[in-house]
Amino acid sequence: MIIAVDGMGGDFAPELVVEGCIQAVKEYEGIHIIITGKKELIKNELDKREYKGNKIEILNAEEVISTNEAPVKAIRRKKDSSMVKALELVKEGKAQAVISAGSTGALMAGATFVLGRIKGINRVCLAPLLPGAKAPFMIVDAGANVDCKAEYLVQFAMMGKVYFESVLGVKSPTVGLVNIGAEEEKGNELTKAAYKLLKDTDFNFIGNIEPRDIPRGEVNIAVCDGFIGNTVLKTYEGVASNLFSMLKDEMMASTRGKIGGALLKPVFKDFKKKFDYTEYGGSPFLGAKGICIKAHGSSDAKAFKNAIRQAKICYDKKIIEEIENNLGNLIENNI
């Protein structure tokens, strides 16, 4: 399997991108990586780490897409950018997956306009996997589509279901529709229409769920439009981050707190690890005609290594084909 990695995307590119790639080719068999970006910079990082293998190569790209550029314009105009070059490798069949920690909007545009959508899929969605109290959960969509139709949400749910079943090995994952109340009649026109459609599928649909229920692990797949999904995601990340800071401040404020903190250090360490995004790799763009993983902007080497592992599993489990097959089932049932 060949994986294209955007070598210039993210806060710590290309240093930690290269480090993550080296770790990945050492740990996972059957992968070859093409790092796109400024050749001299990437080669210097490989040389620093004394990498002498033949499982990593460089494809030169002189341009970089920044996070403050208009996503669609950047993808269309910067043909010599590291992100576009990586996407084109997948489009041309020279790689089977693409990974980038660069601009989310630009990668979304690239997944749609460079890779294209799977035939019959209306919209590509961003599907982050997040730690929950009982088990990880996925939000679909987490920001790619702020305006949606009910049928889009059904497709998002289907693709999330495929990911859980194929990649994570979870049989019959639960699907919940994010809403302001659990009752069927709650919500706006979109959620009411989506509820009716989801109820008629063969998904393990548990009905409406409120945002507070999501991190409790009440559902595997939380379905919503991108506006709601991104709000839920950012709130969740903010609360988790501030919770750790508040606990640390409280413990350091008194002698009793310091003693208690020392005694509970192993517990806090395990708890923090549970919320470590690097364990999950990245967020797939589901519905694209190619495996496309968005790594977190602040990804370290471990996160990149795990994103590469994630891409490999998606490829091995034939996730694109599985989405196509499941889409066919929806169409057969007129949903």
Curated annotation (Swiss-Prot):
Pathway: Lipid metabolism; phospholipid metabolism. Pfam families: FA_synthesis (PF02504). Keywords: Cytoplasm, Lipid biosynthesis, Lipid metabolism, Phospholipid biosynthesis, Phospholipid metabolism, Transferase. Belongs to the PlsX family. HAMAP family: PlsX. It catalyses: a fatty acyl-[ACP] + phosphate = an acyl phosphate + holo-[ACP]. The gene is plsX. GO terms for biological process: fatty acid biosynthetic process; phospholipid biosynthetic process. One of its GO terms (cellular component) is cytoplasm. Transmembrane segments: none annotated. Catalyzes the reversible formation of acyl-phosphate (acyl-PO(4)) from acyl-[acyl-carrier-protein] (acyl-ACP). This enzyme utilizes acyl-ACP as fatty acyl donor, but not acyl-CoA. Homodimer. Probably interacts with PlsY. One of its GO terms (molecular function) is phosphate:acyl-[acyl carrier protein] acyltransferase activity. Its EC number is 2.3.1.274. It comes from the Bacteria. This is Phosphate acyltransferase. It is found in: Cytoplasm. It is an enzyme of class 2 (transferase). NCBIfam families: plsX.
